[in-house]
Amino acid sequence: MIYVDNRQNKVEASEKLIERLTEVIEFALKEEEVNMKCEISLLFVDNNEIKEINNETRGINRETDVLSFPMLEYEDKKVFKDMYKDYKFSQSDFDGDELVLGDIVLSLEKALEQSKEFNHSYEREASYLVVHSVLHLLGYDHMEDDDKIIMRSREEDILNKLNIIRG
């Protein structure tokens, strides 16, 4: 289940956008071989709120586009399908019958700004940021160059399969 909470009023969070981002999340989970019911919270905020959250949680006092808060722990260079595909989780990892994967905090204001900067649609930018964040929830990272190459490849593969293209 994808729980959406819109806590901003600077950029419209239309039903169409919410449906598309929900579809993107569900497809990314399927592509990453997550074979169980999952819970992800998707929180829409503005630039001021994401700056506050970024400062509180990461000690970085500036706005960003998206933040990811995974609930599962991953070994270095391991992702969900490597560690948890056939794992027997404890009941504390679940909310009811759904595995809690974590939270995505997305600045719709920043997504709109970046869509203009990169000259593609708002839907494409928001979708990219959500895929990026889902991959973080599943253990992907981009701090090292080799990890970044893998993560970017997965992002583009998922978006291309959904026909969400640049431009």
From Swiss-Prot:
GO cellular component, one term: cytoplasm
Cystine residue pairs: none
One of the protein's GO biological processes: rRNA processing
Localization per record: Cytoplasm
Cofactor note: Binds 1 zinc ion.
Family, per entry: Belongs to the endoribonuclease YbeY family.
Function: Single strand-specific metallo-endoribonuclease involved in late-stage 70S ribosome quality control and in maturation of the 3' terminus of the 16S rRNA.
Protein name per Swiss-Prot or TrEMBL: Endoribonuclease YbeY
